Amino acid sequence: MIKGLQNYSQQALRTARYIGQGFMVTLDHMNRTASTIQYPYEKLIPSERFRGRIHFEFDKCIACEVCVRVCPINLPVVDWEFQKSMKKKQLKSYSIDFGVCIFCGNCVEYCPTNCLSMTEEYELSAYDRHELNYDHVALGRLPFPAAKDPMVQPVYGIGYLEKGIVERTKGSKTITTLSTN
């Protein structure tokens, strides 16, 4: 009888310890910050090296087609005509289909005139896939940064900014300064 009572009490203590361990894991997860955001109202601020939509400056382009040659899928479409009077190419149109683009950044890296650059824009959804084919006019528009949008609360520090320090200043604006340690 006493041996049975000892076994029962040992099993009860072991069970309580296992339940306590599980409860401690639950409490540990409750103290963590949220890993989700309320998307339309809160937006993540991408890192400095984020590869978003490509920005194109028509006036800088010399129609060398390096971007087409280095693209793994030959995506940019460059239309140009040879100007005999100036003895050089003149760009007529430039377009990129973001429905096909893999955002590798080769075109930006190898462009000799730096007329291509990556923006922080990641909202490229459309109801029709043909709307994702951006011509040189659409590529030239710079997106409105989410950090400056008064209707959106930017979210910092969910893995996009490594050493961000969030400080509250006048009003309800959130400013991030990066420490250089």
UniProtKB/Swiss-Prot annotation:
Determine the domain of life of the protein's source. Eukaryota
An annotated GO BP: photosynthesis, light reaction
Positions contributing to [4Fe-4S] cluster 1 binding: C61, C64, C67, C111
EC numbers: 7.1.1.-
The role this protein plays is:
NDH shuttles electrons from NAD(P)H:plastoquinone, via FMN and iron-sulfur (Fe-S) centers, to quinones in the photosynthetic chain and possibly in a chloroplast respiratory chain. The immediate electron acceptor for the enzyme in this species is believed to be plastoquinone. Couples the redox reaction to proton translocation, and thus conserves the redox energy in a proton gradient.
Q: In what residue span(s) does the 4Fe-4S ferredoxin-type domain sit?
A: 52-81, 92-121
Q: Which organism is it from?
A: Zygnema circumcarinatum (Green alga)
Does the keyword Acetylation feature in the UniProt annotation?
Answer: no
- Which reaction is the catalytic activity of this chain? a plastoquinone + NADH + (n+1) H(+)(in) = a plastoquinol + NAD(+) + n H(+)(out); a plastoquinone + NADPH + (n+1) H(+)(in) = a plastoquinol + NADP(+) + n H(+)(out)
- Cofactor annotation: [4Fe-4S] cluster
A GO MF annotation of the entry reads: 4 iron, 4 sulfur cluster binding
Q: Mainly localized where?
A: plastid
Keyword Transferase assigned to the entry: answer is no
Q: Which Pfam families match?
A: Fer4_7
Q: Where does [4Fe-4S] cluster 2 bind?
A: C71, C101, C104, C107
What is this protein identified as? NAD(P)H-quinone oxidoreductase subunit I, chloroplastic
**Membrane topology designation:** Peripheral membrane protein
Q: Which UniProt keywords apply?
A: 4Fe-4S, Chloroplast, Iron, Iron-sulfur, Membrane, Metal-binding, NAD, NADP, Plastid, Plastoquinone, Quinone, Repeat, Thylakoid, Translocase
InterPro entries per UniProt:
4Fe4S_Fe-S-bd (IPR017896), 4Fe4S_Fe_S_CS (IPR017900), NADH_quinone_OxRdtase_chainI (IPR010226), NDHI (IPR004497)
Member of which family?
Belongs to the complex I 23 kDa subunit family.
Cofactor binding, note field: Binds 2 [4Fe-4S] clusters per subunit.
Its subunit composition reads: NDH is composed of at least 16 different subunits, 5 of which are encoded in the nucleus.
